[in-house]
Amino acid sequence: MKTWLMGLYEFFQAYKTVWTEIWKIRHQLDTPDREKDENEFLPAHLELIETPVSKKPRLIAYLIMLFLFLALVISIVSHVEIVATATGKLAFSGRSKEIKPIENALVKEIFVEDGQFVEKDQLLLHLTALGADADQQKTKSSLSLTKLERYRYEILLEAVAADRLPLIELTKDEFKHATEEDKTRIRYLITEQFEAWQKQKYQKELALQRREAEKQTVLANIRKYEGSSRVENERLKDLKKLFNSKSTSKHDVLTQENRHIEAVNELAVYKSRLNEVESDLRQAKEEIHLITQLFRADILEKLKQNVEAEKQLSLELEKNEQRQIASVIRAPVSYVQQLKTHTVGGVVTTAETLMVIAPEDDVLEVTALIQNKDIGFIEVGQDAVIKVETFPYTRYGYLMGKVKNITLEAIEHPQLGLVFNSIISIDRKTLSGKDGKEIELGSGMSVTAEIKTGERSVISYLLSPLEESVSESLRER
């Protein structure tokens, strides 16, 4: 071990001695200074030694290689965003209220101005539906007449039950719209119908009384011939006894027997007549009852029809009243309204938007149309950059948002073809100008939404054309 250390020491000591001696004569070893012309006349290998090539080209080459290396590293490490562009516009969320008429109407009065702040239930417009007033007046008149008719039939039913005409009162509130002429007509009809029924009933009752009198006459004749037949029978018995004792002739017996037979026959005739009269009495009573039943049934049937008609007219009147109420438009919520009709006396059509009322807490959203080629890469929750076309984003900036909803049912667009509707929420509804002022955004402004669907490396982006060319090469159509 000691020998090895000694050898190492002597080795370094020898190098030290050589270096020291050379250091002493270092000035003698330097190349003498020569002029440029002298260097040019030296041999080629000495010229290269004395005047070596400049290091700048080599340095530039190294720098280029370093730049290419760094560019390669950056292209591998760095990533670019993949975005899908969708066009659309700013719009209020579904809480905005569109005011529309339910039918064609005329603008009678306008109580607000465009952009005015309104309170809930504040009067906005007064419309006049075409023919609504006339329809309502006609329905009221028809309903009033129907109520009078119903009262008429109800009074007649009471009169039939009581067999006398009750007091007719037409002063109730339900008859306040009826005219005096209609009331007089109803009183006349009630009295006329009741008296007509009473006359028919009286005629049948007279017929019944005649049948009753006829019955009494028949009964009297029956009693008469019952007594007469008994007397004639006793006489016949007595004459037969006398004939047996030879005290009278046979002719007297036969005569008496004939009288007895006549009395019995008359009694049988009147008894048969009694059955006929009793049948006529029953028929007369049934006719009296039938007249009352038919009269009552007719009244009930007409009353039923009248009640149904009254229900229909009440519904029609309610419908007309709703039309009148709907013609007076009030604010459903409070905040600013956008008036779209300004002409008093102008005509508005069914479902035409008259104004839009935006609640105070309403928010702006982006309604964008996603093209068919991009829909497969877009999901709810993805970030989006919103650029408002009205305000260049280089000066006013842009909005940030997120995809809120996507409708997976394609719609046909005349320029874009099949597109899908989407809603993108935004972080704010103002843009900042260069002077620092906040610019309020409004509904209807056109925007472009750049939806971030993913990332890819720069090298992948640069090589994608080559990759596509390679994948499509070596093929024959």
UniProtKB/Swiss-Prot annotation:
Q: Does the keyword RNA-binding apply?
A: no
**Membrane topology annotation:** Single-pass membrane protein
Decide whether keyword rRNA-binding is in the record.
Answer: no
Q: Which GO terms describe its cellular component?
A: plasma membrane
Subcellular localization, per the record? Cell inner membrane
What residue intervals traverse the membrane? 60-80
Q: What is its main location?
A: membrane
**Periplasmic compartment: which residues?**
81-477
Q: Which UniProt keywords apply?
A: Cell inner membrane, Cell membrane, Cytolysis, Hemolysis, Membrane, Transmembrane, Transmembrane helix, Transport
GO biological process, alphabetically ordered? killing of cells of another organism; protein secretion
Q: What does this protein do?
A: Involved in the transport of the toxin RTX-I as well as that of RTX-II.
What remark does the entry add?
The sequence shown is that of serotype 5.
Query: By what name is this protein known?
Result: RTX-I toxin determinant D
Encoded by which gene? apxID
